[in-house]
Amino acid sequence: MTEQSVQIRLAQPQDKDTVCRIFQEAGLETEAALEAGTTYWVMERGGQPVGAIGLEHGEGASLLRGAAVLPSAQGQGLGRRLVMSAVEYARARGDRAIYMFSRGGDWHSFGFTQVPLAVVMGDVPDTPQVRAYRARSERPGGSTWMRALDVAAGKA
């Protein structure tokens, strides 16, 4: 069997249902997907969507907004490719850090470290996900994470 090509492409407005379906299958929230101030990507294998990831942009930092690969495509390093492509995009746009909320995952292996919730809420206060939590007077579940980006050296 030949390996099908994998491509990560910028999500378009018509991809919202696809992104939401992939996120829902992974148990992730779909609120604010593809809103203004965000960038999303769809991963395709053989022309079929198998993953999605998003970034919500703040001033000099971004919030990772979902990283999901369909169960049928897991265990092949595709999730790592998605995350690292988002890290590279954030670095290239000049972000000093990427933050995220997570209920699981081995985020240390991606260079993330746990940080207090106040750090994330304070550094990316205008991102859709943070605004939504504040509007509901709700704390995000799980842990809060940060990955510093060495923009000056061109390394993420």
Regions found by a protein language model. Give the residues of each.
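Short, hydrophobic beta-strand segments that form beta-sheet elements in well-ordered domains
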Residues: F23, Y40, A97-M100
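Conserved acetyl-CoA-binding loop-helix of GNAT-fold acetyltransferases
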Residues: V69, G75-E88, Y99-M100
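Conserved active-site alpha-helix within GNAT-family acetyltransferase domains
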Residues: A92, R96, S102-Q129
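Short amphipathic alpha-helix that is part of the acyltransferase structural core
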Residues: M1-A32, E138-A156
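Conserved beta-strand in the GNAT
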Residues: V42, Q48-E56, A61-A68
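Short, small/polar residue-rich loop motifs at catalytic or cofactor-binding pockets
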Residues: E35-G37
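Short, P/G- and charge-enriched loop/turn segments at secondary-structure junctions
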Residues: E29-T30, P128-R136
